[in-house]
Regions:
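Beta-barrel outer-membrane channel/assembly domains of diderm bacteria
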Residues: 13, 21-114, 120-122, 136-155, ...
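Acidic/polar loop-and-plug regions of large Gram-negative outer-membrane beta-barrel proteins
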Residues: 204-215, 308-314
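Outer-membrane beta-barrel proteins
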Residues: 81, 85-88, 158-164, 247-260
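Bacterial N-terminal signal peptides that target proteins for export
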Residues: 1-10
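Residues lining hydrophobic/aromatic ligand-binding pockets adjacent to catalytic sites
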Residues: 124, 131
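Exposed, low-structure sequence patches enriched in small/polar residues
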Residues: 32, 50, 54, 185-189, ...
Length: 549
C-alpha cells in the first residue's frame, strides 16, 4: 500500500495512543451504525441485493487541548444501504484534520466544513441520511482582529465520496458587528451585522469536453467567481435579513451548459415575543447551481446551498411529497405564525392551547415563453434565457398546514393537524402531473405513570393523482428511562392496496442507543434542507446503534 494512504488510516490509532501521554487532552467521539438485512419483496418492488447484510457505519474520534485539536473519521460503506449513488460505496478514513487556535486566530489543515452567510456561495457540510459530505481538504484561517470583526480565508479541493475533485476552491469572508463600534446601537438593543463573501473555482477546461455538435466544442471558463453581500438587523424581538449573491458564467450539466450568470436574492423577517412568533420570507434564485465539477449530477460536488423555503414535515403522510430546491431557478415564499393561548382563557382552557400556521409557496421563473429551456436542450452554448425579475411561471409546490396542540388533563394531550398540498410531480420528478392532497392528522399522548407513556398517531391523506389515498397508524409505548416499543402501518388504500408495516424496539442507556426492527419501507424521497435522495422500497430486519463519548 502507498505509504501516503496509511497516514489517514493510522491517525485514529495515533490519537488514542497520544491520550494518556498528554493528560491535558480530552478524547471525544461517536459511533453510528445502521444495518439492514434485506429481503426480496416483489409486492413493493424491492431491489435485489447479493449482499446478505448492508450497513453504513461511522466512527468519529476527536482529540482536544488548549491550543490544538485533531480528529479523524472512519467510514465503512463497502456494502451501503439502498438508494445511494454508486460512488458512495467504499471504506477508509476520508476525513481528518488538525486545528490550532491561539488568542484570536484559528488555523485548520486537512478536511473542514464552512459556510459563508446563508450558504448561497459556499456551504460544505455532512448529512449522512442524504449521503452528502462535501468537505474541503486544504487550509482555512479564521481571524478576529477586534471584537465584532471576523475574517475568514480558505482554499482546498472538494470531497466527492472517496476522491477529491480536481478544481481548486478558494474564498474569503468578512462579518462586522456595527454595535461593537456604535455604542448607541447596543444601548438601544439593536444589532447590525454586515457581511461579504467571495468564492473562486479554478477548474481545468480539459476536465470535461462538451460538444455542441460533432465539430464544435464549448470554450469553458477556467475561473468561476461568486460573491455575496448581506445585512442582518435585530431589534428586540424583531429581525431582518437581506442577502444577495451573484455568480459569473458557469456552464454545467445542471443549467444545460449555457453561459448566463446566476443570482439569488433573499429577504427574511421575523418577530417573536412571549407566546407569539411570526416569520415571513421570500427568495428568488436563477442559475445558482455551483459545483466543483461542472459535469456532475445528483447530490455530490455542490459548493453552495440553496435552502428550501418549505416546512420540514415530520409526520409520515405529510412528508410523502417533499420539495427539493430547483437549482435552475424559482420564486419561493414562506410564512409561519405561532401563538399560545393563555391558561384560563376561553381558547386556552385549563392548560393552554398552542396554534401553528405555515404557508409555503414555490413557483418557477418565466423563461420568456419557454416552459423548461434546460430540459428541451435549446440553450447549450448560448447566453441563457431571459427572465423578468418579478415575473413568475407555474406552481412547483405549495403547502398550507394548521396545527393545534391541546392538553386536556395532566396526563392526556392531543395534536390536530390539517394540511393542503400541491406537488408538481412533472417538474420535480419528470412525470405524474399536479398532485393535490388533503391530510388529516391526530397525535395523542397519554401518561399512565411517570415512567409509562403511550403515544398514538392516526393519519389520512386524500390524494388526487399518483397512487391515490393513504392511511397511517402508529402506537408507541415508552417505558422510561430505557425502553420504547413502536408498531406502525402505512397503507395505500388507493391504487396498490399495499401495507408498509414496521415494528421497532429501542433501548437507551446513558450515551448508548440501540434499535432493532422488522418491516417494510415505502419508496420515496428523503429530503433535508431542500436536498433530496431517492430511497427505494425495502423489507427486512434493521439494527441501529449510536454511541457518543
Amino acid at each position: 500500500m502507498n505509504p501516503k494512504k496509511l497516514i489517514p488510516l493510522l491517525l485514529p490509532v495515533m490519537l488514542l495512543v497520544a491520550t494518556p501521554v498528554f493528560a491535558q487532552m480530552t478524547l471525544s467521539g461517536s459511533v453510528q451504525s445502521d444495518i439492514l438485512v434485506p429481503q426480496d419483496d416483489d409486492k413493493i418492488g424491492t431491489e435485489h441485493s447479493d449482499d446478505k447484510v448492508l450497513t453504513n457505519t461511522y466512527l468519529d474520534l476527536n482529540l482536544g487541548s488548549k491550543y490544538v485539536d485533531a480528529g479523524a473519521r472512519f467510514e465503512f460503506l463497502k456494502y451501503p444501504l439502498p438508494g445511494y449513488e454508486p460512488d458512495f460505496k467504499g471504506w477508509g478514513v476520508p476525513h481528518f484534520y488538525v486545528k490550532g487556535h491561539y488568542k484570536n486566530v484559528e488555523l485548520t489543515a486537512g478536511d473542514y466544513y464552512e459556510q459563508f452567510g446563508s450558504g448561497f456561495v459556499l456551504r460544505t457540510y455532512e448529512e449522512r441520511s442524504l449521503g452528502i459530505d462535501n468537505a474541503l481538504r486544504g487550509g482555512r484561517i479564521v481571524y478576529k482582529p477586534v471584537s465584532g470583526v471576523t475574517l475568514k480565508a480558505l482554499t482546498g479541493k472538494q470531497r466527492r465520496y472517496w476522491h477529491h475533485n480536481d478544481a481548486l476552491v478558494s474564498g474569503a469572508d468578512i462579518e462586522v458587528g456595527l454595535e461593537q463600534f456604535i455604542k448607541a446601537l447596543e444601548a438601544h438593543d439593536t444589532h447590525i451585522t454586515l457581511g461579504g463573501s467571495w468564492v473562486n473555482k479554478h477548474e481545468k477546461t480539459n476536465a470535461d469536453a462538451i460538444f455542441v455538435d460533432a465539430t464544435h466544442k464549448l470554450n469553458l471558463p477556467k475561473y468561476v467567481n461568486a460573491w455575496d453581500a448581506r445585512v442582518n438587523v435585530t431589534y428586540g424581538g424583531f429581525s431582518l435579513l437581506a442577502e444577495y449573491a451573484q455568480k459569473t458564467q458557469d456552464p454545467s450539466f445542471d443549467n444545460g451548459y449555457h453561459f448566463g450568470k446566476g443570482n439569488v436574492a433573499m429577504l427574511s423577517t421575523s418577530y417573536s415575543q412571549k407566546g407569539m412568533s411570526v416569520l415571513l420570507q421570500a427568495k428568488r434564485s436563477e442559475g445558482m447551481s455551483f459545483r466543483s465539477r461542472r459535469s456532475m449530477s445528483g447530490t455530490s460536488s455542490y459548493i453552495n446551498h440553496l435552502p428550501a423555503f418549505t416546512h420540514d414535515q415530520t409526520y409520515a403522510l405529510a412528508a410523502q411529497y417533499p420539495y427539493a430546491t430547483n437549482p435552475n431557478g424559482e420564486w419561493a415564499f414562506q410564512a409561519e405564525f405561532g401563538y399560545s393561548f393563555k391558561k384560563g382563557t376561553t381558547l386556552g382552557g385549563k392548560y393552554g392551547t398552542k396554534l401553528k400556521f405555515n404557508l409555503s409557496h414555490v413557483r418557477g421563473l418565466d423563461y420568456d415563453g419557454v416552459k423548461d429551456p434546460v430540459a428541451d436542450g435549446r440553450i447549450i452554448g448560448s447566453n441563457g434565457y431571459k427572465s423578468s425579475f418579478f415575473k413568475m411561471g407555474e406552481t412547483y409546490y405549495q403547502d398550507i398546514d394548521v396545527q393545534i396542540e391541546k392538553r386536556f388533563s395532566r396526563d392526556f394531550s392531543l395534536i390536530f393537524m390539517y394540511m393542503n398540498e400541491r406537488y408538481n410531480m412533472t417538474v420535480i420528478e419528470g412525470h405524474g402531473g399536479m398532485i393535490k392532497s388533503n391530510i388529516l392528522i391526530a397525535d395523542g399522548k397519554y401518561k399512565f405513570s411517570p415512567k409509562l407513556t403511550l403515544r398514538c398517531e392516526l393519519q389520512y391523506q386524500f390524494c388526487k393523482g399518483d397512487d391515490g389515498d393513504w392511511a397511517f397508524g402508529l402506537a408507541e409505548l415508552s417505558w422510561a428511562p430505557h425502553w420504547m416499543f413502536t408498531v406502525s402501518d402505512m397503507w395505500n388504500c388507493g391504487e396498490t392496496k399495499v401495507h408498509y408495516y414496521q415494528a421497532l424496539v429501542t433501548y437507551s442507556l446513558k450515551s448508548h442507543r440501540i434499535q432493532a426492527g422488522y418491516g417494510r419501507t415505502c419508496a420515496g424521497f428523503n429530503c433535508s434542507g431542500g436536498v433530496c435522495r431517492w430511497v427505494p422500497a425495502t423489507r427486512g430486519f434493521t439494527l441501529s446503534y449510536n454511541y457518543s463519548f
